[in-house]
């Protein structure tokens, strides 16, 4: 599998266009023509993480936080420059999945919510993208192979269902002329073929991969296919809100979250005996959504990087906050590894996928 193919799979499942405009996602360092020897997931790409990739003979790192984010003015043998140089010198590709993974329904916030054990979950702040209906015409005796090829690319899937197609039978006709090299039929002779009209749905970020799949796998030289924009929309968005299976006090919940997330410390605002049942969570830095979460009925808003004045404002307005530190997003390492194993199952014998064990938290706790 080449890096370019991996990028298509990632864009299919974690669309790059869903990242914030200020973000820097995608292939940041590398060559999309290289074959993959292994994948290492990490929260941050540090020198220790690069060394681990080298030891594992893994030439692809997928990080949540972009190594190249603010303007890089020089690449020298210290600071970020030394990491970038080491990546290039060792032919290691670096891919960033940042805010596009944050807003993904299966992304960082869902991983945190699952770790805490939230149920009946929904998104705090939703966006949407459009679906398209695809229709094309396939010779009847080729239809199953064609559907298999689409399924292998992750197309025609809806939630937990695969092979989501509609078929209708018909008869096609054509006459090969000139330099045609027909899969069926003879030159200068009208050919009638039993065909299947195949229809299925895709998301807007799957348009290009679907077009390529049809052109690469359809038996005809010039296949006919249509993309029809539908009213149906798919949702993605920032933050998760859900319920605990039992009510706790705020003090109990803070200890519970600390244990479930395996983090060294937490801090909270609010009365220690406040009842907590409904929980909203945004990993990383989610301040700015605490009041919307409260309006949605959340008893506590869980995030990281909470500043003094934001905490004071929330306390005055009786909005409970729980600060789980930015590094709590480390759960994405194992979470993304599991997602990649599902998305890349047909390549599972070609290369290994690892979740980095390197702790990249810059803080020490006492």
Swiss-Prot record:
Q: Where does a divalent metal cation 2 bind?
A: 65, 326, 329
Q: Which residues bind a divalent metal cation 1?
A: 64, 102, 329
Coiled coil start-end: none
Q: Which domain of life is it from?
A: Bacteria
A GO molecular-function descriptor: metal ion binding
> Which keywords belong to this entry?
Metal-binding
Leader peptide range in chain numbering: none
GO cellular component labels: cytoplasm
Question: Which InterPro entries does this UniProt record tie to the protein?
Answer: DUF34/NIF3, DUF34/NIF3_bac, DUF34/NIF3_sf, N-reg_PII/ATP_PRibTrfase_C
Q: Which Pfam families match?
A: DUF34_NIF3
Q: What family does this belong to?
A: Belongs to the GTP cyclohydrolase I type 2/NIF3 family.
Summarize the subunit comment.
Homohexamer.
Q: What is this protein called?
A: GTP cyclohydrolase 1 type 2 homolog
């Amino acid at each position: 599998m080449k890096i370019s193919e991996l990028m298509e799979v990632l864009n299919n499942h974690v669309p790059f266009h869903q990242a914030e405009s200020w973000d820097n996602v995608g292939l940041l360092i590398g060559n999309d023509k290289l074959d993959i020897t292994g994948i290492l997931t990490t929260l941050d790409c540090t020198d220790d993480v690069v060394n681990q990739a080298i030891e594992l003979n893994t030439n692809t790192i997928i990080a949540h936080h972009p190594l190249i984010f603010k303007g890089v003015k020089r690449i020298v043998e210290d600071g970020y420059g030394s990491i970038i140089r080491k990546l290039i010198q060792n032919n290691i590709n670096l891919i960033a999945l940042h805010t596009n993974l944050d807003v993904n329904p299966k992304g960082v916030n869902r991983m945190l919510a699952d770790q805490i054990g939230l149920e009946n979950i929904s998104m705090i702040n939703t966006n949407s993208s459009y679906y398209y209906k695809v229709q094309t015409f396939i010779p009847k005796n080729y239809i199953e192979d064609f559907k298999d090829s689409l399924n292998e690319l992750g197309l025609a899937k809806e939630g937990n269902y695969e092979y989501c197609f509609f078929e209708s039978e018909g008869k096609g006709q054509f006459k090969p002329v000139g330099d045609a090299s027909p899969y069926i039929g003879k030159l200068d002779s009208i050919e009638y073929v039993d065909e299947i009209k195949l229809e299925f749905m895709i998301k807007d970020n799957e348009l290009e991969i679907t077009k390529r799949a049809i052109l690469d796998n359809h038996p005809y030289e010039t296949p006919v296919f249509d993309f029809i924009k539908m009213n149906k929309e798919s949702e993605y968005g920032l933050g998760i809100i859900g319920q605990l299976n039992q009510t706790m006090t705020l003090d109990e919940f803070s200890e519970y979250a600390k244990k479930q997330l395996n983090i060294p410390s937490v801090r909270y605002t609010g009365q220690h005996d406040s009842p907590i049942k409904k929980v909203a969570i945004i990993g990383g830095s989610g301040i700015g959504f605490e009041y919307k979460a409260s309006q949605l009925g959340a008893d506590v808003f869980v995030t990281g990087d909470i500043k003094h004045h934001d905490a004071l404002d929330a306390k005055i307005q009786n909005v409970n906050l729980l600060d789980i530190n930015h590094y709590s997003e480390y759960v994405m390492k194992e979470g993304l590894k599991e997602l990649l194993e599902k998305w890349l199952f047909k390549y599972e014998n070609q290369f290994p996928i690892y979740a980095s064990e390197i702790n990249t938290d810059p803080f020490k706790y006492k």
